[in-house]
């Protein structure tokens, strides 16, 4: 299922593991999720300069869809990170080599974890979500999990 809202875009992986972005699947997706707007399309930035700086999450791929980038930007933490506006995020994604990239849910939802060989998860960034003044990992109904392909 792909989102048909013109302001959102779907991200899906085909059966060969290549990533695709857009509103219509050209192949039956094996896995899919939705993001917000495309910030890089056909190697060009699609967002203007300025706007608010927030924690951000983005997913992007090279032109062939064989290399995937997941980026999390911390924010709302004075003296540590103020976040990025959409143009800054799009610029980073393009500089990484993304042909297409989309903005995902951000703010306190911007968290990146890594599971080590022992099966323990380590949070790799400094999430901005707070509850009763305490920093926490926001409970989320959906996460995007990427794992190494089995040999």
Where in this protein do the model-derived segments appear?
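Gly/Ser/Thr/Pro-rich low-complexity, intrinsically disordered segments
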Residues: 1-151
């Amino acid at each position: 299922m792909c989102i048909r809202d013109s302001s959102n875009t779907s991200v899906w992986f085909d059966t060969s593991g290549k990533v695709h972005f857009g509103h219509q699947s050209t192949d039956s997706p094996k896995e899919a999720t939705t993001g917000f707007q495309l910030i890089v399309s056909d190697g060009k930035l699609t967002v203007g300069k300025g706007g608010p700086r927030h924690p951000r999450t983005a997913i992007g791929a090279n032109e062939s869809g064989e290399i995937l980038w997941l980026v999390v930007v911390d924010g709302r933490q004075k003296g540590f990170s103020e976040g990025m506006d959409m143009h800054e995020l799009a610029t980073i994604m393009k500089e990484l080599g993304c042909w297409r990239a989309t903005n995902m849910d951000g703010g306190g939802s911007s968290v990146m974890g890594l599971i080590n060989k022992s099966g323990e998860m380590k949070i790799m960034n400094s999430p901005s979500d707070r509850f009763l003044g305490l920093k926490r990992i926001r409970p989320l109904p959906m996460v995007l999990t990427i794992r190494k392909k089995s040999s």
